[in-house]
Amino acid sequence: MEANSNSAVPLCTPYKLGRFKLTHRIVFPALTRNRSQNNTPQSHLTEYYSQRATNGGLIISEAAAASDISKECPNLPGIWNEEQVEAWKPVVNGVHEKGGVFFCQIWHSGRLSVPTVSALFFSIGIGWSTRPDDKVYAKPTPLPLESDKIPCIVNDFRIAARNAIKAGFDGIEINASSGGYLIDEFMNDQVHGWTDEYDESIKDRCRLALEIVEAVANEIGADKIGIKLSPFDGKKDSNSEALATYMANELSKLGVLYLHVMEPRETVNRSLLPIRKAFKGTLIASGGYGKSDGEKAIDENYADLISFGRMFLANPDLPKRFEVNAPLNKYNRSTFYTNDPIIGYTDYPFLEVAS
């Protein structure tokens, strides 16, 4: 953790994230955009991420599925096979050419999965689910994951992390946030309803998350790992603070590089203090932040970095706009999850600076 030394624009001060020297504290987080046909990154992703890359700026990719059975819908990217690895390479190169630091978020979408092969984890029954692209998908009805299948899940994350490094990413972020996603389903006692060695206590419910982190750390190194949590969002655990604090302590022991925590938007700057005290690495705060409260969080050492999702989506040069206090583009919500490679994706205007 580093204290801020520039009271003028705290978000634009440098920060050392492990071996990475960041020039500002503004993070572009993982945002699902639904533009990777057949779960493979397309060429327009290169322009999209390159537009938002800055020298010494941290970017986290949209969630990439760890395996074929973990994907949420057909137009989200994956990182489980060689074709996907090769497709990610020009995207990563585009960010690196701008001097950016690029982490790949990896996930298993849990009960939201639309697997091509579903025999491992689902019953024969079919359920229906409407996803962000407004299409309705037939899904196998989810059943509790049998504990003897868990090593397969852990190994999927390990291989996906290895593939991400092979594609050129600087590190990976494990998605353990809420929304029906697998890791959070295990951690949250309001969702996880079966009894085995992964249930009962907080320690048991965090076991899967920590087994995944440890396996990935053994594969690529803990100094290349971040993890995203949202303990106060969605269907909350009965003791969210205790759960998050336990995870923060355990992740510190494993030497994880950063912890990325989503806050409930109505209580920004109030819920991360116990986590801040428990976690010894870099803390990234997220959750409806604007420029002023983001600066306050950095200035008061509440968090080390702040991620801005929709604001960064609509303003590809957001760090520059913050630096010069320029007006911001408004985002167009209707284009968030379309398949269009340009509209609402790469056509947001940059700040025009007079020569």
From Swiss-Prot:
Kindly state which keywords UniProt assigns to this record, in alphabetical order.
Cytoplasm, Flavoprotein, FMN, NADP, Oxidoreductase
Positions binding substrate in this chain are: N175, A176, S177, S178, R265
* Induction trigger: Seems to not be influenced by wounding.
Which residues does the record give as FMN binding sites? A30, L31, T32, A63, Q105, G288, G309, R310
Q: Give the Enzyme Commission number.
A: 1.3.1.-
Q: In which tissues is it expressed?
A: Weakly expressed in flowers and roots.
Cofactor(s) recorded for this entry are: FMN
Q: Which GO terms describe its molecular function?
A: FMN binding; oxidoreductase activity
Q: Look up the domain of life of the source.
A: Eukaryota
Q: Where in the cell is it found?
A: Cytoplasm
Among Gene3D superfamilies, the record links this protein to: Aldolase class I
InterPro entries documented for this protein:
Aldolase_TIM, OxRdtase_FMN_N, Oye-like
Q: Which residues form the active site?
A: Y181
- Give the residue spans that cross the bilayer: none
Function text: May be involved in the biosynthesis or metabolism of oxylipin signaling molecules.
Protein name (Swiss-Prot/TrEMBL): 12-oxophytodienoate reductase-like protein
Species annotation: Solanum lycopersicum
Q: Which gene encodes it?
A: OPR2
